[in-house]
């Protein structure tokens, strides 16, 4: 069985779109776990109604389970961890309540994962204007590659449930939670983020699915939406957490990649006209390549992460 864990907070206006996509999911057995995070609108009632619908619907091709949990601790990560604690599936994946789930995603990913710990893939984002973009992804990404390209996003993988529990679940971050989570997912390293983390550090077995899945909706109040300067304080907190709490487990190359990524984000803030906010985002190092990346992005240059990745792979500009 695969458990699909979905945090929900005040999403009554997007839930029917989500439910419509979940009704088309072909894989069985599947367990949908909605974790209400203190909604003040009708979200929890709508989730419970959908769960009742699933219970009443006969399933000709295997078990279909759905449950609504309540998580009093605020934050999507707390809700995901509550769902992870509850999950009964051998495998699990995570999703957001304002997006659309691909019907054959679980069937295809379950085939691809084989005996691996994690199966990665790519997802599709959709803007409010209707523009579509395929997120970065390729087989067997390195930690430093994820730091620059963000190969792991919330919806871009399935994994063994015991493995996700062992690496500590989700860290309590206000933004870019999947950026930090992806480091541990790819490496098998963990911090004692939660009680019960018992995994010895090891490299996980990774599988790859070549498909492009889901419709991830970007908007101002989504987890992934908004401008850089509006999220500057939260992004800065996420970077500091990664630098001091997570990257201490990795080699110097990972720290260099993080510095490049911070420089790129600083450039985006400058491009948006917010130079003071960019200065507040500490690089932690003075480096010519970082400065060049920042200036390039501030001038609205594109593909800076690819340039930075080339520097990393050539191993010419580290230190």
Regions found by a protein language model. Give the residues of each.
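Short aromatic/hydrophobic "clamp" motif used to bind/position activated sugar donors
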Residues: 92
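Catalytic core of nucleotide-sugar-dependent glycosyltransferases
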Residues: 210-220, 225-253, 275-286
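A conserved acidic beta->alpha catalytic loop
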Residues: 21, 36-46, 96, 102
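Glycine-rich, basic loop-to-helix element that forms the pyrophosphate-binding segment
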Residues: 71-87
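Membrane-interface aromatic/basic loop that binds lipid-linked glycans or pyrophosphate carriers
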Residues: 266-319
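Short, acidic, metal-binding catalytic loop of nucleotide-sugar glycosyltransferases
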Residues: 20-29
